[in-house]
UniProtKB/Swiss-Prot annotation:
Role played: The key enzymatic reactions in nitrogen fixation are catalyzed by the nitrogenase complex, which has 2 components: the iron protein (component 2) and a component 1 which is either a molybdenum-iron protein, a vanadium-iron, or an iron-iron protein.
Protein name: Nitrogenase vanadium-iron protein delta chain
Keyword Methyltransferase included in the entry's annotation: no
InterPro entries, per the entry: Nase_V-Fe_dsu, V/Nase_d_su
EC number, UniProt record: 1.18.6.1
Source organism of this protein record: Azotobacter vinelandii
Keyword terms: ATP-binding, Iron, Iron-sulfur, Metal-binding, Nitrogen fixation, Nucleotide-binding, Oxidoreductase, Vanadium
Reactions mediated catalytically: N2 + 8 reduced [2Fe-2S]-[ferredoxin] + 16 ATP + 16 H2O = H2 + 8 oxidized [2Fe-2S]-[ferredoxin] + 2 NH4(+) + 16 ADP + 16 phosphate + 6 H(+)
Cofactor annotation: iron-sulfur cluster; vanadium cation
Enzyme class: oxidoreductase
């Protein structure tokens, strides 16, 4: 796993995934965690969670992302489960930093939302 793999995934999410930009901090955190956990399950051959409507929603977004990752990035088929988990943890951290921590959108934490 290299920094370039993390950069590849981050650029992909920034370009293609709207779930990272929900209107509240807790929504963004929930989506980042939920979708990327499902992506991890799909990329490592585990059965995705689909027991609740929320899990099915995350699964739908994750399925498209996992398929795109396999198609766009040849390295995705060469990394093991631990590397995928490490990579997705790094991606989660970067997304939280960019879309929540350093966001200038004051509505994210507005008390009336």
């Amino acid at each position: 796993m290299s920094q370039s793999h993390l950069d590849d995934l981050f650029a992909y999410v920034e370009e293609r995934c709207l779930w990272q930009f929900f209107s509240r901090t807790w929504d963004r955190e929930e989506n980042i965690e939920g979708v990327l956990n499902q992506v991890g399950r799909l990329l490592t051959g585990q059965e995705p969670l689909r027991g609740t409507p929320q899990e099915r929603l995350f699964y739908a977004d994750a399925l498209a992302m996992a398929n795109d990752v396999r198609e766009r990035f040849p390295w995705a088929s060469q990394v093991n489960k631990e590397e995928i988990e490490f990579l997705l943890d790094g991606l989660k951290s970067r997304l939280v930093d960019v879309t929540i921590t350093r966001s200038t959108n004051r509505e994210l934490n507005h008390h009336l939302y």
